[in-house]
Structures are given as structure tokens and as C-alpha cells.
A protein has these predicted regions:
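Histidine/acidic residue-rich metal-binding segments in metalloenzymes
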Residues: 78-93, 98-178
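Active-site mouth loops of central-metabolism enzymes
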Residues: 4-17, 40, 45, 64-76, ...
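Metal-associated gating/positioning segment near the N- to mid-region
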Residues: 1-61
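Class I S-adenosyl-L-methionine
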Residues: 23, 75-79
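Hydrophobic faces of well-ordered beta-strands that scaffold small-molecule active sites
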Residues: 2-6, 34-36, 66-70, 91-93, ...
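Short, surface-exposed connector motifs at secondary-structure boundaries
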Residues: 31-34, 60-65, 167-177
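Alpha-helix-loop-beta-strand connector modules within alpha/beta enzyme cores
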Residues: 47-65, 110-127
Length: 178
């Protein structure tokens, strides 16, 4: 059983969670492999050097198999070949603010530049599919889940999916929303 969407946060933010505890918990729950997301760690996994640092951080801390997603941000398009050749399984981007300053969201021009590289490597492109199309959403989030849902207009997701379908058709790259 593989959990392909895990934020382990190591190196750099082990007070949130590190590989030792995350993989022990996974093993206790019957998970045999985790695939770590590229953000919430320091540095974010957007370059070959950052990926090497991530690999060094997991040494002797794994209780299950592991894999890693790299990240696509506006500043690393030229580094994608090296990152993919280093062994990440694919890449992830946000179309909206990720909440992490070191992992800014991409625009259509960044996606358009990245997708041919991803197609060449035949790897998936995971997209956080919310596209803020302007206008501020004034919904108040409280302890009710429905209040969170109200803060995320359906149009944001619909527009993001439409953009990614268009980009995937243009480039023949694989895409997925997450």
C-alpha cells in the first residue's frame, strides 16, 4: 500500500515531522511506501542539490520504502532535467499561493515551459488545482468544514482543471490534480 501524497518536512522542519516518525507511523498502519511532497522542507525539493540534501536526510531513518516528488516553481524550469535525472518520480506545482514562500505558485507560461521537459522524461505533473481568477473571497473560515469549502470557490478548481487539460493536450505530458 503506497501513500503518494505525504508531507514529511525533513530536512529543516522536523519539529513538524521527520522521516523516522513518519515512516514508523506508516509501517504501523500497514503502509509499505511513502512518496514525499517537495514543499514544507528546507530547502524545498526543486533542484538537484536540494534533492541530494533530502536523500542525505533520510539515511538510517526509513521504516518503509520511499519516493520523492520534485517541485516546479517559476525559478527552476532550467533545472528540471537535472532534478528529474537525479531520481524524483515526477513533479508538483501550485496554481495558487502554496503558503510557503520558497515554493511560489506557477503561471501558465511556467507550465508551458515545464511540460515538454516532463513529457520527455515521461513523468507525471501533479497540480494543486486552484486557480485564483481575481477577486477576493471574503468567506470566513471557522471550525466548520463547510466554512472552509465556502472559502474555495468551485470556479477556482474548474478553471485550474481546464487550464491543465489545455496544457496537457498541447504538450502530451501527463498531469494530475492533487
Amino acid at each position: 500500500l503506497v501513500d503518494s501524497h505525504v508531507h514529511i518536512n525533513e530536512p529543516g522542519r522536523t519539529e513538524w515531522e521527520g522521516f523516522n516518525t513518519a515512516t514508523q507511523a506508516a509501517a504501523a498502519g500497514g503502509i509499505t511506501a511513502l512518496v514525499d511532497m517537495p514543499l514544507n522542507c528546507i530547502p524545498v525539493t526543486t533542484t538537484k542539490a536540494a534533492f541530494a540534501e533530502k536523500l542525505a536526510a533520510v539515511d538510517d531513518k526509513l521504516w518503509v520504502d520511499r519516493g520523492f516528488w520534485g517541485g516546479v516553481i517559476p525559478q527552476n524550469i532550467a533545472d528540471l532535467d537535472d532534478l528529474l535525472n537525479a531520481g524524483v518520480l515526477g513533479v508538483k506545482s501550485f496554481l495558487i499561493d502554496s503558503g510557503i514562500a520558497e515554493f511560489p505558485n506557477v503561471a501558465a507560461k511556467d507550465i508551458r515551459a515545464a511540460m515538454p521537459i516532463l513529457a520527455k522524461h515521461d513523468v507525471p505533473y501533479l497540480i494543486h488545482a486552484e486557480l485564483d481568477c481575481g477577486g477576493f473571497n471574503h468567506a470566513v473560515i471557522n471550525e466548520k468544514y463547510n466554512s472552509f469549502l465556502a472559502s474555495r470557490p468551485k470556479k477556482w478548481e474548474n478553471d485550474a482543471i481546464a487550464l491543465m487539460v489545455e496544457m496537457a493536450r498541447e504538450s502530451k505530458a501527463k498531469g494530475d490534480d492533487c
